[in-house]
């Protein structure tokens, strides 16, 4: 019941005038005015992804949510308009679609949402837009091993960009065949190897009370973040 109430609340209050999800709401100050709305392509994509999983489950149970479907289609149609000529998406944008942060490193976040939209709605434009994101990723990110701009806060190099690239190519491989599919598998593998480089083995002492403290000479596997 609580989950349904949350979703119903989003239907009533969770969308901007342009049809996107509100990324951030301060309930002490109220909803941001239209000119102060800031959207992140990652947050919008992850929200679409989550709702499509919900809709897929509901559909399997014989339940249909037309209003939700219309909202998600509107957002995905908006993605097609937001996409640049080279296939990338601005990291952050205004409600009217104009760029706030034009960096394209968050582009793979949109790939998975577009592929899921294609599988759910059967709209080929979503798949074509997803294909173009991979063209951008291969040329500007994966081939250069320069994974950046996928965090929600800082615009920096980070493991999240590599993980997003892995996921994007995995999803593309799931809906394609032959040489095209193999291309995505190869790119997925390259990005996965880079993501692994953010993991290190440490054999060093840590101060007592530190979350990593353990007997000296014991090997630890730690996740190393750009913020650490």
Which role does the model predict for each range below?
Residues 1-228:
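Glycan-recognition and catalytic cores of secretory/periplasmic carbohydrate-active enzymes
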């Amino acid at each position: 019941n609580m989950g349904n109430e949350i979703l119903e609340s989003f239907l009533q209050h969770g969308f901007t005038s342009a049809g996107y999800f509100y990324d951030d709401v301060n309930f002490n100050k109220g909803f941001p005015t239209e000119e102060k709305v800031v959207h992140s392509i990652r947050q919008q994509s992850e929200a679409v992804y989550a709702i499509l999983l919900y809709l897929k489950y509901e559909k399997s149970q014989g339940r249909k949510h037309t209003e939700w479907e219309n909202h998600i289609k509107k957002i995905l149609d908006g993605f097609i308009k937001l996409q640049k000529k080279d296939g990338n998406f601005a990291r952050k944008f205004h409600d009217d679609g104009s760029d706030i942060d034009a960096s394209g490193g968050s582009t793979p976040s949109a790939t998975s949402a577009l592929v899921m939209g294609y599988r759910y709605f059967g709209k080929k434009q979503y798949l074509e837009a997803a294909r173009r994101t991979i063209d951008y990723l291969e040329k500007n990110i994966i081939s250069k091993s320069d994974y950046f701009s996928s965090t929600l806060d800082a615009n920096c190099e980070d493991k999240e960009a590599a993980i997003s690239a892995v996921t994007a190519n995995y999803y593309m491989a799931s809906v394609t065949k032959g040489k095209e599919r193999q291309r995505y598998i190869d790119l997925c593998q390259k990005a996965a190897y880079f993501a692994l480089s953010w993991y290190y083995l440490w054999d060093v002492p840590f101060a007592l009370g530190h979350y990593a403290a353990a007997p000296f000479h014991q090997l630890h596997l730690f996740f190393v973040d750009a913020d650490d």
